[in-house]
Every structure is written in C-alpha cells, then in structure tokens.
Amino acid sequence: MPGGLAVSTVFATAGFADLPGVFSDWITSLDMAPMLILICILLGYAVLGMFMDAIGMLLLTLPVVYPAVMALNGGEAVSAAEATFGMSGPMCAIWFGILVVKMAEFCLITPPIGLNCFVVAGVRPDISVQDVFKGVTPFFIADGVTIGLLVAFPGIVLFLPRLVG
C-alpha cells in the first residue's frame, strides 16, 4: 500500500507540474529536424523496452511523449498542408499510436527482457532461452525494417483511415 501511495503521489505531482507541457515545449524548442526527434523518441522506446515491460513503458511514457509529438506536427487541429509530418492532427495521432504499439511489440522480443521469448521457453522446456532468442532474430530484423518503413512512409499506416474519410 505505501508503494501505491508513493506512485500516486508522483503521478499527481507530475500532472500538476504540467510535465507533458514542459516536455512538449522543450522538444519543440530543440534545433533538430522533427523526424530526427521522432527517431530519437523511438530509439528511447527501444532502450526502455530492453529493461521494462511494454505495457508499463507505454503507461509511463505516452502521457508525456504524445503531446510532444503532436506539438512537433503542429498541434491537434493542424491541417495536412501545414503539418510537419505531412498529416493532419488526428491522422498523426493514429500514425504515432501504431508506431508506438509496433515499438512495444518490438520490445517484447528484445533481449534481455524479451517477455515473449521467455514465455516460449517456459512453454517448451526442451528449448533453451538462448535458442529462442536466436530463433527470433529474423523477426527482430523484420520488425526493425517495418518500423523504418512506417516512419519513412506514413502513408502505409494511413491508407485505410484515409479511405474511410
């Protein structure tokens, strides 16, 4: 119970201190290309995913990172013509959400935590964890390429949402 109270206090304090707003202001004031900042954020997720559970990582970071990415794009109500990433605010939210979920999936097979690999090794006692990590290497590479494509060509992600309207 004291641990839960401590965590609640930290989150309440961070919310009252406007941590997402401060982080967004800091990110947008950097003298870097917005796409480079996005890549740094995704690399940060990859590093965090090596040591944290994916859901915990998302719950702790998204309230701070999402407003920063939206600010980089030009805001929630920006039109596609004025946006940094070339898409309107709602489309950018969909794109970033899919990128983050894909990063969470990527982190589930990333050593040393790689939760999915440990689950497979636990279900199949005849296979060692090292063999499982060797076996997921092609998937690790494919996920990296997929994330790269989703960053480079956001139209892949937004094809169906644009058809709907």
Regions found by a protein language model. Give the residues of each.
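Alpha-helical transmembrane segments of multi-pass membrane transport proteins
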Residues: 1-165
